[in-house]
Design a protein with these regions (language model features):
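N-terminal cap/lid segment of alpha/beta-hydrolase-fold proteins
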Residues: 1-29
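Polytopic alpha-helical membrane proteins, predominantly small-molecule transporters/carriers
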Residues: 3, 11-12, 18, 50-54, ...
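A generic structural signal for alpha->beta connector loops
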Residues: 13, 62, 103-105
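Short, surface-exposed "cap/lid" segments of acyl-processing enzymes
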Residues: 21-70
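Cap/lid segment of the alpha/beta-hydrolase catalytic domain
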Residues: 41, 50, 71-85
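Short linear Ser/Thr-Pro motifs
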Residues: 46, 76-77, 112
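Alpha/beta-hydrolase active-site loop
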Residues: 80-101
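Alpha/beta-hydrolase fold nucleophile elbow
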Residues: 101-112
Length: 112
């Protein structure tokens, strides 16, 4: 299962893409969450991101995957790329995984 959502905190709106196995689509807490980050000029909406998420959640059905757009990438509304905002986005996504999804373990998968 896949859905899009935004994390709206601290005046930011982080565009996210969320994946879980269909057998866990009604769950709200996941012990394991993989955060997918992309390279410069890319976005959360690549085929590689979807392929990774589908492969991971089919093998490890209790995992969730979150991909997000960095500032000035994909569907993000920002017009100027600033490293401090990149760090804020990553912190907001990490906090969401821990606080909202209840992640006990976080993983990172990066593509370029």
């Amino acid at each position: 299962m896949e859905k899009h959502f935004d994390i709206n905190e601290e005046g930011y709106s982080v565009r996210c893409r969320f994946f879980v196995h269909d057998s866990h689509k009604n769950e709200r807490h996941f012990d394991h969450v993989a955060i997918v980050t992309h390279g410069f000029g890319s976005s959360k909406d690549t085929a590689g991101t979807a392929h990774f998420a589908e492969q991971l959640t089919s093998k490890y059905k209790d995992f969730a995957v979150i991909a997000f757009d960095w500032p000035c990438h994909g569907e993000d509304a920002r017009k100027k790329l600033a490293i401090p905002e990149c760090m804020t986005y990553l912190t907001l996504v990490t906090d969401y995984a821990k606080d909202t999804l209840g992640a006990k373990a976080l993983y990172n998968y990066s593509t370029s």
